Amino acid sequence: MASTPRIVIIGAGIVGTNLADELVTRGWNNITVLDQGPLNMPGGSTSHAPGLVFQTNPSKTMASFAKYTVEKLLSLTEDGVSCFNQVGGLEVATTETRLADLKRKLGYAAAWGIEGRLLSPAECQELYPLLDGENILGGLHVPSDGLASAARAVQLLIKRTESAGVTYRGSTTVTGIEQSGGRVTGVQTADGVIPADIVVSCAGFWGAKIGAMIGMAVPLLPLAHQYVKTTPVPAQQGRNDQPNGARLPILRHQDQDLYYREHGDRYGIGSYAHRPMPVDVDTLGAYAPETVSEHHMPSRLDFTLEDFLPAWEATKQLLPALADSEIEDGFNGIFSFTPDGGPLLGESKELDGFYVAEAVWVTHSAGVAKAMAELLTTGRSETDLGECDITRFEDVQLTPEYVSETSQQNFVEIYDVLHPLQPRLSPRNLRVSPFHARHKELGAFFLEAGGWERPYWFEANAALLKEMPAEWLPPARDAWSGMFSSPIAAAEAWKTRTAVAMYDMTPLKRLEVSGPGALKLLQELTTADLAKKPGAVTYTLLLDHAGGVRSDITVARLSEDTFQLGANGNIDTAYFERAARHQTQSGSATDWVQVRDTTGGTCCIGLWGPLARDLVSKVSDDDFTNDGLKYFRAKNVVIGGIPVTAMRLSYVGELGWELYTSADNGQRLWDALWQAGQPFGVIAAGRAAFSSLRLEKGYRSWGTDMTTEHDPFEAGLGFAVKMAKESFIGKGALEGRTEEASARRLRCLTIDDGRSIVLGKEPVFYKEQAVGYVTSAAYGYTVAKPIAYSYLPGTVSVGDSVDIEYFGRRITATVTEDPLYDPKMTRLRG
């Protein structure tokens, strides 16, 4: 067998052992798995996990992980018994809000290919006789959910992979990570150094300690979560012949933050209905492997009965039969939580070859392991990992204070019904643009992303609702789609289309790539030919080696060796920094290149609208005519005495520019434009109007409209790919592909009734079959109809009808050519 890289996996829990198995399946054979605990019971979260697997999730990625986990554990058998008991899952509603949310969740299930159905109260009780039918309003049943035997699965995976040559070393504590030349070289243990080409930390709630060994911030917080077992329940006698047997579905009562499973004739109850209990792993004491047992392990803390008593009372109301039993034993078990609730996956930006797979629960374990194995062996995962990427957080989101507060908030809200736009109440105002004071004066309604305060609309524009033509007034929204929205956005869209508006674009990531090797780097990473004269601005894509879209960016060549990039967050930053480091280290002096994140030190105003040129001419002597600054060109100008880089581009589809200056000059630039714009009716406009105008123009948004799971032709972005270019990452994979030949294509949908507004991720049906899901959606104020985008089979044509399911209601939509607004680009080039 050919030699493969030396892999060291830290952690022999459900993720680490699954990863070893997935790597073996792909032909990698030089693998060592370490754990500080005994292999038969490592003592991490896996060892006490109750094993409930509910697959349905708002995230396509997380649902994909869960589906594969079920599939794999079902196939992992010994003596004819698998590691997954597919009893099904039942989620019940005791409030109208929860019942509506179950309808939405059923939509997610349909979108992600998971079978489920809504049950009436009577059907819930028939399926689960112990339920108190009087308080149940309905339920969601997913037959393929069930119970994972996580600890047993770990032992079978160890047995299987050991026979394939994997080395396991239990009771082995990691004391450090060896490195040389910016790359991992080994793992230090008390017994010596284990050489390694790749190290993967699957250390669970110890993950932050392992990361700290290389100076890496791993943003997870260990939190204790309560779990109890009851004494025998009389109504359960004779139902299960195994001590941990179960025949009833796993049960979730999210209105009270509770879940349930059978343990033979006893019940297991998990509760999030208590105060957050953060755990400092340094207080757990020295690890003593010889003392680990089922009831004594580092991840299992003493039970605090007083925290559980309200949950016990709620349990007896939901399941009256449990009133005849008592709490027999319980514990506070440690799990990992993160600032946004997602797992932490991928390669460290600090050290090449050091990977993490942390904050992963049993539900997603095998799916995550598969994705990580694909990433290691091929350089990409078949499942898009953007929302799980360890590099996704901004620096301000990696501080211990931020990680602690937000992770505890996620614990409190874990079962809450949260709107997609639901803002955090705290921490806020972490990052504000230089225009923030002016935004507040204008009554901005702020939402937060990446730590940035982003205005969505301005109350100062409310009076415009009485001035604008009646056809611009949007229809009344239902309660859900109406949350965190305002009709004022329509007025802001109207002013953008008919006069001029100022948009704060500061939070969008800006990178400077410079040095003699800058062009070489960008040519290899992007799909466009960037060998253009200074002043050129280019829209282009970053692809992975299989042709998946890993990002879309704009590149402005400011000089021979300096480029400004408009990127998509810290994932792009880490990608460019790593590529620049590799090129600089491996090349000659002429290959030297550096990447700087300039976002915090700069700011940007999008000045857009048919009167934008009239406005800017009042405060600048520079030539902003079509000849003076052509479409997709940049130049240095002076506006109101302030040095500015102006780029002629617009993501709202109107004449205008992105105007960049240093942060210290930002408020002066805003004030100069604002004052000069008063005769032209200038307004400040927010992200709500921006999103609507973007969709009317057919512009894609990375992370929703396209990911690594889509190629440029499927996404309708073939124009951004220059196949005549000598080389770029992903080029080989795109050979022979065309938009017309794509098996699926991103399509524009317009809602037939003109008033039903969806938000995203709703399933799309064609001829009664779920064939896609909504990627982006908004009300189109200019076109006076709701808009949605969805990937649909290539056989679906313009003019065909589809149905979008929204809270259980089917909404008819028509496949429409895009863009809906200004397809000939006359407004942009005006």
Swiss-Prot record:
UniProt: (6S)-5,6,7,8-tetrahydrofolate binding residues: Y539, T554, G566, E658, L659, Y660
Q: What is the effect of changing Y259F?
A: Reduces catalytic efficiency 225-fold and substrate affinity 25-fold
Upon changing H225Q, the result is:
Reduces catalytic efficiency 3-fold and substrate affinity 30-fold
Membrane spanning residue stretches: none
Entry EC number(s): 1.5.3.10
Species: Arthrobacter globiformis
Q: Please give the function described in this protein's UniProt entry.
A: Catalyzes the oxidative demethylation of N,N-dimethylglycine to yield sarcosine, formaldehyde and hydrogen peroxide. The oxidation of dimethylglycine is coupled to the synthesis of 5,10-methylenetetrahydrofolate through an unusual substrate channeling mechanism. This channeling occurs by nonbiased diffusion of the iminium intermediate through a large solvent cavity connecting active site 1 (N-terminus) and active site 2 (C-terminus).
Identification of the protein by name: Dimethylglycine oxidase
Free-text remark on how the cofactor is bound: Binds 1 FAD per subunit.
Q: Where does FAD bind?
A: 14-15, 35-36, 45-48, 52, 174, 259, 360-363
The protein's GO terms of the molecular function aspect are: dimethylglycine oxidase activity; nucleotide binding
Q: Which UniProt keywords apply?
A: FAD, Flavoprotein, Nucleotide-binding, Oxidoreductase
Family matches, as Gene3D superfamilies: Aminomethyltransferase beta-barrel domains (3.30.70.1400), D-Amino Acid Oxidase, subunit A, domain 2 (3.30.9.10), FAD/NAD(P)-binding domain (3.50.50.60), Probable tRNA modification gtpase trme, domain 1 (3.30.1360.120)
Activity versus pH: the note is: Optimum pH is 8.0-10.0.
Q: Which cysteines are disulphide-bonded?
A: none
**Taxonomic lineage of the native organism:** Bacteria, Bacillati, Actinomycetota, Actinomycetes, Micrococcales
At the top of the EC hierarchy, this enzyme's class is oxidoreductase
